[in-house]
């Protein structure tokens, strides 16, 4: 071993004379190769963010030249870089290309949002060293980690802020951050800061989230009365929020008093252009602005303001303290990106793009870091192409940065991070007054996690206005609570206040009394309803076609169902009325679709005799009850409890005062933790969406026109009421009452519902409730409660356009668009921002609709909210729809229901037959997914517990060469191949007493002896099945590779096993135990076109008799050690036939085993 290492060291020292190194298990070829993934195409004028990639090729060439000059790193000389343009190739596809490139040792670069890219690389065991990714490594679970992130961590800001708070003993602060432009990374940074402040018992007196471009004067004045120490986090460009807030404090003379201090943070990513400007640039003096003309401040005022301001940033260190870094920056500027081919071949790089020095610094550090780790690994003969081995050399390392500072990679593959500190002062070296980087906060070593300050050439020296740090609390407190009034003036003050109060009471007695009654009413929680006052009812939505079939089957005729439909679209009954309706027949129909009038859900079942608490807990989104003799609707709010603050009580008061024929009536609230419900009047005919989705419900122009008129009338009322807007307009929130009038619901309560914890939707349904939401609200990161009323009103106009599109097109809110809801929502949110045409529904759906409707829809969903028409303009535009119509909506509805009832009488019988047929299909499908005995237990409502089987046999097979076939074939060809092969297999296994467990890619798993035991016949059935499958693949043809043969490899093992149903959605019958693992090892260590058999299975086959078994020998298996293995070569079909006939009476499952007449033998 020692001689091998010495020989390896000799090779490495003389690598320039060799083109490869022979290691123990692999050959390393030189030069080494890496992939670099970045959106290079965005630097050529494309309207997308190049993420600093423009100068990467230039910097890479300089970095490689530096490595070539280092004789200690000869293994990394002449590094071969393959540039992958992610702007032309989707990020995941580019990552997959890099992952499958076996000739590279790592993938560099990646994207900011690199979760999918990193996951693909990790799954494929490819090292990733990213200098731009902003992913949280804690989110990576389920496979070995192979990623290293060189970008700053999200907790760097929190650690730097705590450094200053601890140093000056500040315990009370104000936190200010933008309400817009927050990326996922910025959100995590802010969250980590809040966690750190809370953990260190720092009182957050103010937490303001402001629009950087709005007038914040009043808010700054309000905040200044509540706090003295301000932490301002700004991710906007040109430090708009920090500058605006700070200069407003200056205009109020707060900063000049010396009693205030601002600790500001600006993102280098959005401010690097002016942060890297020369010292004479006015933007460095004015925090990103060229002048201060918009503020009532002078330059001398600014000098006083800046004394109590420290700026933090996540950028790179300055160039001046380090000559090497300064020289590299000069070389990068001289080497123009346009001359770098690849990747800029036959393209022109935009001249306006400036270098991103943070990205370039991280590139140099990444290359040097990867070179050092590779050299260390090869020095001891480690395999650098095996990620789990190589990754150990990449973590817990020190990095000597090109900027002259020391960085650290922790044990999780993430850089420890650092923060640059800026301060305004007059620099002697630059002979100017400006914002200069003066120090750096970071860890001093990998093990010492305490952050310390390191000064640059001109270090941090805070020149406080009052020569000392301000206190976090005024001497007398923020409200004078620490200081009493002067002793001599107490009597005068009391008399004066008393007289003033009496005069005020005399003048405003009537007003105060009215106000008192209003406030008393607010504090009395007048809207609260005792849960015991509501009698819960079962209900189902009869507009559901499945529910109609159930109703008809229960009542035995169409007349009963249609009569109920005339009066209401809900069937309601008492919980204890079990004789009239079988709950399982209506509510447990197997459908998971939701369609209630206040959101999804057709009703809830519940068990007769359940306690009152259980009944309330089982209510999903929507329920029905009886309150004070009237039927009411219960809308669940997804909060475990509610603190009725004054603002929430005011919301509820406005809601109760909203009385209009086109809005739903608010009745009250039921709050008994963990259940919170809003109680409304019940809209008897469900929602507009229920009607539109029912293909059997005929609609005419009168219906559509009247519905349109009602919706606009309801919106007009809300916009002019104290509530001000709707915010959640969609067809499911347009309810239909007994008189066929539209009543809008789910408006108001923006603050109460702003903290709802919504249930997670599945991937297909994710985003479906946002299909009506305007793009500006989709981009609004702080939720509906933080939006201005005017913005939400314009958003209501957009939502109205989608509802009209749905009403007149009757193909849903997005017509026949095939994409999933979440994909539609993503395109609506992002397409316009990327400079593309805004994504909207296909107007071809409305080609048969009136032109005025088409024109209104197009105008109302305009991207710019200010260009959308007002409700008054829309109402005037659509007025011709109702002119000349003499019949009322009720007359039309009565006629419509009569037609609908006649149609039902003809169709119900046919649908009953269809229902029976669908039931049979469902049972057949269930038995295809689960064993028949398990499926029968589930149909009876019984629980299926895990069961232990003393002896069974497990079968695994796969197709060697499948991975290579997948790499060289089209995906559709692979799917056709697997479908053809498994169709043959599935037909064959029907002839044996076996159960197919699952297929994964080319792997096929079968078991025998469970869930119905069959004695020792399980081993024989599996062996016979394997022989039949081997015979079948001899004649099997691969469609796209007709000259290739399937080389099936089979493994089998017998032993004890535990089996049971796992999961609630898409349940699977799964097997557990060492028997399964050993069977898998038999297959993976087997020989193609052979049945590889374990010793335990061989013993059972010997007992059964009739099988030809050949000893293979001892095989080393991972996790199992050395195992004796055998081949099953053939069988005597006569012995099997006699054995099965003899044992069928004893083991019923053998009855499905068909007896083969021919013996299969293989050489």
From Swiss-Prot:
One of its GO terms (biological process) is intracellular signal transduction. Its main location: membrane. It is a single-pass type I membrane protein. It is found in: Cell membrane. Residues 587-882 form the Protein kinase domain. GO terms for cellular component: plasma membrane. Residues 1-17 form the signal peptide. Glycans are attached at residues 102, 296, 322, 346, 466, 488. The keyword Transmembrane helix applies. It comes from the Eukaryota. Residues 953-1083 form the Guanylate cyclase domain. It is an enzyme of class 4 (lyase). Pfam families: ANF_receptor (PF01094), Guanylate_cyc (PF00211), PK_Tyr_Ser-Thr (PF07714). CDD domains: CHD (cd07302), PK_GC (cd13992). Expressed in ASG sensory neurons. GO terms for molecular function: ATP binding; GTP binding; guanylate cyclase activity; peptide receptor activity; protein kinase activity. Belongs to the adenylyl cyclase class-4/guanylyl cyclase family. This is Receptor-type guanylate cyclase gcy-21. It comes from Caenorhabditis elegans. The gene is gcy-21.
